[in-house]
């Protein structure tokens, strides 16, 4: 164990020595010639201003990017002069992942190609493509068109594929190697969870600092089309509703409801989810809390004439505490994360406690050390260690 810790410390020192010589600017910072910390603290975690920027179609109001469009002489054409692109590269060295008792060079863990921006006034796009995700070409995950400020109001419309949980907490922008496990939980053969799906989303902000989100979804994830060239495997659509209320500058409370039905082979499973979440932000601390209840009436798709349907209860959540000693100007931070999933389907049961230390080597280069104790898992109790380097440029 002592030798393993020495190896981890040595690797972290090598990563820091190599990374301090690198410099890069992500796509939106490049476009507006602004620092990454305008929207991120630390990257890729979004600040409130970053959320506002994304909600405005990746445009800073009252600030035009110089020479953003090509002047073709056709006023009816909006043609980007340069395609906004960025890359995100992550690599880790892990020990005892999934209780394997192995030291593993998990690098590159992912290599992501990102592009996004305004196509024209109030219309924007965003997508990213995985050149590599844990050793395979995973393809497109987020990919959508956004219509901003419809009918002159604060109503926004998205169509494409996105994470269902994005209006709650954005798991793709989390700081930890450890995931938000409850968002991935789906009992039996159900395809519906709170990760990626295809559909449409409406968002609306009220003057009372109330944010409302409605999602209409296929409920089948983002797999390939069937032989009929349909992405959905049945005639049903799932509905998600979200409301979030700011209560002053330091506290936010949210609620979420999900109602769905799936019948891939004409045998149905009906489900619902209810969730509550909260954020308390009192500098230099931020505390995020998520709780979710889920019910499925036939997630194993038992045929009524052959076997009785098995109802499944699933519940869980996470609690995350982030410490930024100097706020936006912090060069290092600490994070603690508790995960909990409890289900009638035992393979979903999970519990873990994570401690994470991160240090910015540059504004867009982050080195991390993470220790996770999984006290409930299909792999039995175990400790996982990970040292990582995350870059965006």
Where are these regions (language model features)?
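The canonical Cys-X-X-Cys-His
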Residues: 33-43
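Outer-membrane beta-barrel "beta-signal"
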Residues: 35, 245, 381-393
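Outer membrane beta-barrel
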Residues: 44-47, 80-95, 99-222, 235-239, ...
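Hydrophobic, lipid-facing positions within transmembrane beta-strands of outer-membrane proteins
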Residues: 67-72, 83, 91, 109-111, ...
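Outer-membrane beta-barrel proteins
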Residues: 72-78, 119-121, 146-151, 206-208, ...
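Transmembrane beta-strands of outer-membrane beta-barrel pores
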Residues: 91-97, 129-135, 161-165, 216-220, ...
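Detector for outer-membrane/organellar transmembrane beta-barrel domains
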Residues: 234, 244-344
């Amino acid at each position: 164990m002592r030798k393993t810790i020495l190896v981890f410390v040595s690797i972290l020192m090598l990563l820091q020595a190599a990374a301090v010589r690198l410099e890069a600017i992500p796509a939106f910072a490049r476009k507006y010639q602004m620092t990454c910390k305008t929207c991120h603290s630390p990257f890729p975690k979004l600040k409130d201003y970053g959320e506002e920027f994304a909600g405005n179609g990746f445009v800073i109001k009252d600030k035009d990017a110089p020479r953003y469009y090509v002047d073709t002489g056709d006023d009816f054409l909006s043609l980007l002069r340069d395609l906004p692109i960025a890359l995100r590269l992550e690599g880790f060295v892990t020990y005892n992942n999934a209780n394997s008792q192995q030291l593993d060079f998990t690098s590159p863990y992912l290599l992501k190609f990102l592009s996004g921006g305004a196509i024209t006034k109030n219309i924007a796009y965003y997508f990213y493509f995985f050149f590599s995700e844990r050793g395979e070409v995973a393809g497109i995950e987020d990919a959508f068109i956004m219509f901003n400020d419809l009918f002159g109001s604060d109503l926004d419309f998205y169509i494409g594929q996105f994470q269902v949980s994005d209006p709650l907490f954005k798991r793709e922008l989390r700081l930890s190697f450890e995931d938000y496990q409850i968002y991935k939980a789906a009992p039996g053969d159900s395809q519906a969870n709170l990760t990626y799906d295809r559909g449409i989303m409406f968002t609306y902000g009220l003057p009372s600092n109330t944010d409302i989100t409605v999602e209409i979804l296929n409920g089948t994830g983002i797999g390939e089309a069937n032989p009929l060239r349909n992405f959905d495997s049945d005639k049903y659509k799932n509905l998600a509703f979200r409301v979030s209320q700011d209560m002053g500058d330091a506290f936010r409370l949210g609620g979420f409801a999900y109602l769905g039905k799936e019948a891939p082979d004409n045998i149905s499973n009906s489900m619902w989810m209810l969730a509550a979440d909260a954020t308390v932000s009192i500098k230099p601390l931020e505390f995020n809390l998520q709780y979710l209840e889920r019910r499925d009436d036939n997630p194993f798709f038992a045929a009524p004439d052959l076997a009785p349907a098995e109802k499944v209860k699933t519940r869980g959540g996470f609690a995350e505490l982030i410490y930024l000693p100097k706020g936006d100007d912090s060069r290092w931070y600490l994070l603690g994360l508790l995960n909990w999933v409890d289900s009638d389907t035992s393979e979903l049961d999970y519990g873990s406690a994570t401690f994470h230390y991160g240090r910015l080597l540059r504004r867009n280069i982050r080195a991390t050390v993470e220790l996770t104790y999984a006290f409930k898992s299909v792999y039995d109790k175990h400790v996982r260690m990970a040292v990582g380097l995350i870059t965006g440029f």
